[in-house]
């Protein structure tokens, strides 16, 4: 195998995905043509189908790549030494507020932007969204459980149910931020989150 060729091919694919994430994170999936992505990526138009079978397959890969990176970032945050889980969870939601800007999220709000749009358009993209969001909720649930065990958190109900409620709260806040064009929904979500978690002082 020619490792140089393989590496170059992977680099081109990654460039297309990163460019698509940035553009579609701002404009949505349906509104963006492949030519716009490829031109911005500096990739010849005829080479797209060497990497992706269709625009739908590209969208599925886009979401899979997005969630892989997102979940890895969550894992790094929740493995930070010397921090109680309450601190780590607070840092996670504070980072959410900072990254999901209504002005320009630079592709970091892809799940929010594409969630409602593609769920009814593509079964494979909906499955990628379902799998990715399940991974987020699972990590939140494990962090909540660990917080209860280390004594930094106190909450009612199961960690799984609370994790799902918190994710839905913040997903809704992300949509409202885009509607009202200010950060107030995030401020409310963070206040509600802290009330639900009863962090130890």
Locate predicted features.
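N-terminal intrinsically disordered/low-complexity leader segments
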Residues: 1-11
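C-terminal peripheral helix-coil segments that are non-catalytic and often amphipathic
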Residues: 1-3, 87, 91-99, 134-150, ...
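Amphipathic, non-transmembrane alpha-helical scaffold segments
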Residues: 9, 17, 63, 67, ...
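Short alpha-helical elements of helix-turn-helix
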Residues: 14, 18, 109-112
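Helix-turn-helix
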Residues: 15, 19-57, 61
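Hydrophobic alpha-helical connector segments
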Residues: 61, 65, 75-107, 159-166
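Amphipathic alpha-helical segments used for helix-helix packing
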Residues: 88, 102-124
